[in-house]
Every structure is written in C-alpha cells, then in structure tokens.
Amino acid sequence: MKFKSIGIIFKPKKKFSWSFTHCMVPTVLKINNNKIRIFFGSRNKSNVSSIGYVDLYYENNKFKVIKYSNKPVLKPGLLGSFDDNGVLPSCVIKKNKIFYLFYIGWRPGVTTRYSLIAGLAKSKNLDSFKRVTKSPILKLNDSEPYQILTAPTVIKKDNKYYMWYVSCNKWQNKDLPYYDIKFATSKNLIKWDQTGISCIKLKKDERAVARPFVIYEKNFFKMWYCFEKKRGKYKIGYGESLDGKKWIRKDDKIEFINNFKSENKMRAYPNLIRLKGDTFIFYNGNNYGEEGIFCAKLLN
C-alpha cells in the first residue's frame, strides 16, 4: 500500500480570528464523484479550537479549493462542559437526510494535562451543526475510568452502528497518557454499548494508537490509524479484521514516498477517500497539523 505525498492542500486562514493556526484531524465527507468537504479543527490565538471546513474539487488528477468556511460550523461548548475549551471533528455520517458529526471535546485538566471526550452534533445543510446532547456520548465506567474516550469513527452494519474510538489505559504522569483503540455498538447513535474490547493494542514500545478510520469492503474491516513510539512522532498504521473486534496489525503494508519536510517527523490522524477510481489519504504532518492538511495518493 504505497502512497505518494502530494503535500499540503489547505492551510489555516489566518485572516479569520478562529483559524489562526492548525487544521487538525481532517475529516472527509464525499459530496459527489468530484467534490469532497473536509472538516477540520483550527485554533485561535488563545489556542482554543473550533471546527470549520474546506471544499475540494477533484479533476484531471488535481484538487482545487472551491470554498472554505469563514466561520465555524461548531464552536466550543458551555463553560464547565466537557468541550468548553475546544472541539475537533472525527467522523461525519448521514442518517435519514441528517448529517451527524462525531467530534472531540477538549478541556484542560489539573492533575492531568487534559480530557478528550466524544460528542455528537447534527445538521441538515453542513454549514452549521447543533449539539444532539450537551453531554458526552461515551461514558466513564469501571473498565474505562480515564477522561480520554474520543476520536470515534462510525459505520453502519447489520442494522446497527459500530464505533471504534480512542480509550485511555493509564496516565504515566501528568503529561503522558497511554491509549489504544476500543469498540462500541449502538442502535441510535446516542446511547453506546462500550464493550471494553481493545481492537488495536499497544505494542511494548508504543505509547499511543489514535484516530481510527474504518471501512468495510470485500467481507472484512479495514482500519487506518496512527501510532506513536516517540512523543510527537506519529506514523500511520493499518489493520484488518473479520468481525470488527479482533484485529491484525499490518503496519508494514503502509509506505509513503515523495516526503515533504513538514511531514518528516509526523504523519497523524488519517482519513481515506476514493474518488473517480483513485484513492487518497488525508492527514496531518509535523506538530499535529500546524501547517495544514496533507494529502497522499495511493499508487496502483
């Protein structure tokens, strides 16, 4: 699975106060065979993130920016809530003509650096989203007591919804959480049965596995994710599963060529899309997407 990096396709629009830096966690929605909308999280000068988007048109083997949001589609939540200091996109799906945005709510901590918990918003037009609930959709429990339950990806299969998400296993110190990918199911997108099953487990030399993206094709599940051995040096990995619960990691199947300097230390938060017979992966480069959104094309 060899990808050729195209480079940065969209940068933060610093003329907007809410989008001074970063385009984090690119989350792609296919509009038609040529057009996609990529949601992303951008930070203001106070380092607080909101969610915006860019529309890209694909033709003649090139992406062209045709529109981008001049204001956020989702802002941070109420003071004191789980998402009061920042929101990031994670997954968008459509149900009964309504678009549902699964997002990451961020707030700083005291004994630990931060909490990251998943929320849910909805929209009819994709230009603004309203929270379905003011509380998180993933809950703390005895097997998941830490406040990192986040970055979900969701697909529908067998008349129910499957979710894979990031779940914290421990904090080594105030600044160093360890987390992997777990699995949940739902019938209505709001109430989730958190199974506690670790799908993509940490290897001995790893600290984190993050931002899963899952598709189902040819009778098995495929997942792209990022994993970290050294702090701030995420790499993109890949796994396969027959049932969505037990996964085989095949990280060595992923290869990138034509690397750019601004992605030489990190590739994180992958999201894959197929357009007109071509396959692309969108992701962030060094420093968690500070410079913008990267794209790479799968070579046949």
PLM feature segments, named:
Residues 1-21, 25, 29-85, 93-147, ...:
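Beta-rich carbohydrate-recognition and catalytic domains
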Residues 268-270:
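C-terminal structured domain segments
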